[in-house]
């Protein structure tokens, strides 16, 4: 299935760019621009492209702009989506690091939902925050929060993870309770892939898989491993795999990625990419 990754690049000088991209070593090439793979949306894009190659499917396309926290690039992306919706004909979209803006979020969501058929919608990071804040979380097919972000989704009053109430930020063994609470408050997508010491795959409020192994503690301090998980599930969904199976395989592959790479905390996502084929093939067995 055709897929579009929507996010940002942490550079003030990066223009709005859209289209096919390719990965070469630790660099992405998109619309005449070069992007170094570190973390954030570039990490997601790199992993999705590498995984698509393993799956023998076309790599997703991307729509990104530079944003270092001012929101200027994010607003350019939002506006481009709304103004060009007739040309956004992908079967699925993965929304990533964009500055949360409820008004723009709602315009994007409504225009996409007006399509027939409506595309699959995946959200992580800043766009997931906007989806929750808008009250439209249940309109999404998949959120990919980490253990801290599931506490935010479970808090019906927090406008941002920074403001999640302390009584919800306890031990990670409370994640099942927080998942239940997020659904009760209608702050969860139809499916969740929660990354943590245990990875949870959830469908309409019911946990359908828990993944605990292989356990590679050195992966935790590496920036971008949540982005790699979202990149993996993006590629798997784009291959046509069913949602819960895509989530389970992505979680397994992300763990095998750490196992085969044997990383140190100094690693970045680019250092993990050479091990992705082996990790994904193992997860697919």
Positions of predicted regions on the chain:
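Positively charged, low-complexity intrinsically disordered leader regions
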Residues: 1-25
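Short pre-catalytic strand/loop immediately N-terminal to key active-site residues, enriched for Gly-Thr
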Residues: 31-36, 213-224
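Conserved phosphate/ATP/ADP-binding segment of small-molecule kinases
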Residues: 130-208
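Short, well-structured alpha-helical segments that form the helix of a local strand-helix-strand
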Residues: 175-185, 242-258, 276-277
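Short, small-residue alpha-helix embedded
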Residues: 221-252
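Charged C-terminal helix
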Residues: 255-285
């Amino acid at each position: 299935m055709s897929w579009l990754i929507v996010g940002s690049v942490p550079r003030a000088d990066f223009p709005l760019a859209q289209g096919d991209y390719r990965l070469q070593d630790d660099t992405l090439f998109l619309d005449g621009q070069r992007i170094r793979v570190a973390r954030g949306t570039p990490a997601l894009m790199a992993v999705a492209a590498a995984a698509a190659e393993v799956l023998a499917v076309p790599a997703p396309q991307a729509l990104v702009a530079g944003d270092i926290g001012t929101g200027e690039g994010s607003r350019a992306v939002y506006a481009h989506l709304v103004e060009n919706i007739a040309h956004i004909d992908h079967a699925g979209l993965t929304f990533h690091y964009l500055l949360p803006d409820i008004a723009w979020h709602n315009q994007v969501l409504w225009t996409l939902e007006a399509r027939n058929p409506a595309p699959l919608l995946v959200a992580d990071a800043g766009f997931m925050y906007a989806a929750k804040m808008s009250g439209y979380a249940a309109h999404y097919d998949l959120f990919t929060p980490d253990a801290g972000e599931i506490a935010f989704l479970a808090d019906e009053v927090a406008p941002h993870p920074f403001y999640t109430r302390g009584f919800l930020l306890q031990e990670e063994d409370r994640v099942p309770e927080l998942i239940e609470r997020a659904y009760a408050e209608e702050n969860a997508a139809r499916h969740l892939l929660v990354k943590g010491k245990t990875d949870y795959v959830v469908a309409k409020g019911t946990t359908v898989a828990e993944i605990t192994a292989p356990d590679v503690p050195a992966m935790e301090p590496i920036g971008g491993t949540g982005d790699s998980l979202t990149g993996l599930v993006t590629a798997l969904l784009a291959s046509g795999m069913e949602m819960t199976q895509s989530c389970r395989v992505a979680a397994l592959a992300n763990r095998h990625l750490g196992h085969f790479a044997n990383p140190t905390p100094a690693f970045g996502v680019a250092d993990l990419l050479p091990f992705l084929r082996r990790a994904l093939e193992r997860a697919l067995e």
